[in-house]
Curated annotation (Swiss-Prot):
GO terms for biological process: L-histidine biosynthetic process. GO terms for cellular component: cytoplasm. Transmembrane segments: none annotated. Its EC number is 2.4.2.17. It comes from Parabacteroides distasonis (strain ATCC 8503 / DSM 20701 / CIP 104284 / JCM 5825 / NCTC 11152). The keyword tRNA processing does not apply. It catalyses: 1-(5-phospho-beta-D-ribosyl)-ATP + diphosphate = 5-phospho-alpha-D-ribose 1-diphosphate + ATP. This is ATP phosphoribosyltransferase. Its main location: cytoplasm. GO terms for molecular function: ATP binding; ATP phosphoribosyltransferase activity; magnesium ion binding. Feedback inhibited by histidine. Pathway: Amino-acid biosynthesis; L-histidine biosynthesis; L-histidine from 5-phospho-alpha-D-ribose 1-diphosphate: step 1/9.
């Protein structure tokens, strides 16, 4: 049995639960239940505060964890980074009152900065040769300048709307963050095998993100040109049709290039274009 530590609530919790469900790990969580066994897969899920996950994985309370990069870097625990998961993206940034003129990190010299991430902030200031007072608070960091508690803040930024509503502006991005999969350094052979299977499932989900499965009918005389347009995983799949002058073509394309590619296919005579979503992809 492999124990996974995940955040107990919030955006990271929601996106983690979605990933686990897509990976075939089914959970029925009650409000007060902190440890749950999954159905159909040898894992159990431990629900914790995000900032407790790195230590819990490092000391073996949990075998692996899904945690925000901000907490993983801040805590500096001896847990191994296994995989970047690509969701819950945000950034740790410095922000100052919006009307202040900013020309560089020297602005923070002698200032007081409020934060919940003192270790990361201290490292940044030392690299820049800036001496500032760090005021550690937990929660509602963004209000600190407005109530005279600090001159600036160092905090998580997603959309930036919270900064705007508190008359602040972002001036330095210190650490881009996303969800990470981390693991204890001393997992047994059995647990490593379960982790490998879990990674296989996660990667199949990630590879499929932003991809579309395309089926179309193509005139044989234009087939070579159509194949050049379609990227495919290796090469498009070509299937004969009852009409000898036409073939069926199947391929995978990136959604960000979808309309550009579809336009080219139509101009080359492709017909009956069918586009399907892809849930998972094994490569």
């Amino acid at each position: 049995m492999l124990r996974i530590a995940v955040q107990s609530k919030g955006r990271l919790y929601d996106e983690t639960m979605m990933l686990l469900e897509e990976a075939g790990i089914k959970l029925n969580r009650g409000k007060r239940i902190l440890l749950l066994s999954a159905k159909g897969f040898p894992v159990e899920v431990l629900f914790l505060r995000d900032d407790d996950i790195p230590q819990s994985v490092a000391n073996g309370v949990a075998d692996i964890g899904i945690v925000g990069e901000n907490e993983y870097v801040e805590k500096g625990q001896e847990a191994k980074l296994i995989k970047r998961l690509g969701f819950s993206k945000c950034r740790l940034s410095l922000a100052i009152p919006k009307d202040e003129e900013y020309k560089g990190a020297e602005w923070f010299e002698g200032k007081t900065i409020a934060t919940s991430y003192p270790a990361i902030l201290r490292s940044f200031l030392e690299e820049r040769g800036v001496k500032a007072d760090i005021h550690v608070i937990s929660g509602s960091v963004e209000i600190a300048p407005g109530i005279g508690l600090a001159d600036a803040i160092f905090d998580i930024v997603s959309s930036g709307s919270t900064l705007v509503s508190n008359q602040l502006r972002e001036v330095e991005v210190v650490l881009p963050c996303e969800a990470l999969l981390i693991a204890n350094n001393n997992l047994s052979k059995e647990k490593l095998e379960i982790l490998d299977e879990l990674l296989f499932r996660f990667e199949a989900i990630q590879v499929a993100e932003g991809k579309k499965y395309v089926l179309l009918n193509a005139p044989k005389e234009k087939l070579d040109e159509i194949i050049e347009v379609l990227p495919g995983m290796k090469s498009p799949t070509i299937t004969p049709l009852a009409n000898d002058e036409w073939v069926s073509v199947q391929s995978v394309i990136a959604e960000k290039h979808f309309w550009e590619i579809i336009g080219k296919l139509k101009s080359l005579g492709a017909e009956g274009i069918l586009v399907l979503p892809i849930e998972k992809m094994i490569v």
